[in-house]
A protein has these predicted regions:
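Hydrophobic residues within beta-strands of alpha/beta enzymes
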Residues: 19, 165-167
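Acidic/aromatic-lined carbohydrate-recognition and catalytic surfaces
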Residues: 1-155, 159, 172-223, 233
Length: 259
């Protein structure tokens, strides 16, 4: 964070007026910080809260706002919420998606990082959903307490002077009402752009008062039509979004791993 602050004059000369900082929160770093263990504290490898306060203040002097990366689809399994869930606290078990019985995973969905999207917890006799790494447990956005916790995170950083928010894979936060196997794919058709995703986004933006902030949504496996809706002014959800359609123009038979 100190290094970024030292470069602010150079960035100002370039015409930069917003800086997007990728996650610097406390994290085991299994996914470059996108496995957040504490949304309100800074990982010592990046600096201190004092360093961040200084960066925000120095940025404001130069009319450079900071945009923080919010990873709200999942947390690290090192997060206090998940650790308390594993300890048997029912409240925190409902913060995540625990399902099924010991004999087999609830669905045949595949993780975007490979393997099953479900991990079994023998002490609970249930499986938890992780669309990404096994250490990134998906949050249960159907639980209003979870949504309120995440709003409080936004309010915390907003009070610090943050001027924008980028939401990681935000179009995956709404999971289906019915959990079923996908015999034609990896399961993404059941959880991408889910049934309540627009409702959740409207609520998050409205209740935290960030309608006029720069808000960016990363869209995983979505359509251009959905992108237009997420960023439409009348929807009051996001300022803009980015997708990955342009990366697929040279895929060979739809496979990104072949040249």
């Amino acid at each position: 964070l100190r290094g970024v602050a030292e470069k602010l004059d150079y960035l100002k000369d370039l015409g930069v007026d917003y800086l997007w900082l990728t996650p610097f929160f406390v994290s085991p770093q299994r996914d470059n910080g996108y496995d957040v263990a504490d949304y309100r504290n800074i990982d010592p490898m990046f600096g201190t809260m004092e360093d961040l306060d200084n960066l925000i203040a120095e940025g404001e002097k130069r009319n450079i706002g900071l945009m923080f990366d919010m990873v709200f689809n999942h947390t690290s399994t090192s997060h206090e919420w998940f650790r308390r869930a594993l300890a048997g606290e029912k409240k925190y078990q409902d913060y995540y998606i625990f399902k099924g019985a010991p004999d087999q995973p609830p669905t045949n969905w595949q993780s975007k990082f490979g393997g099953s999207a479900w991990e079994y917890v023998s002490s609970l006799g249930k499986w938890y959903l992780h669309l990404f790494d096994v250490t990134q447990a998906d949050l249960n956005w159907k639980n209003p307490e979870v949504r309120e916790e995440l709003k409080e995170v936004i309010r915390f950083w907003k009070a610090k002077g943050v001027k924008g928010f980028r939401f990681d894979v935000v179009n995956l936060i709404s999971k289906p009402e019915i959990w079923e196997d996908d015999f034609e794919g990896d399961g993404r058709k059941f959880y991408t752009d889910g049934p309540y995703v627009h409702e959740y986004l409207k609520e998050l933006v409205r209740d935290t008062g960030i309608e006029d902030y720069v808000t960016v949504g990363e869209m995983s496996s979505t359509t251009l039509e959905h992108c237009i809706r997420y960023s439409g002014a009348e929807e009051k959800e996001l300022s803009m979004c980015f997708n990955f359609h342009h990366l697929k123009v040279d895929y060979k038979d739809g496979n990104k791993w072949e040249l």
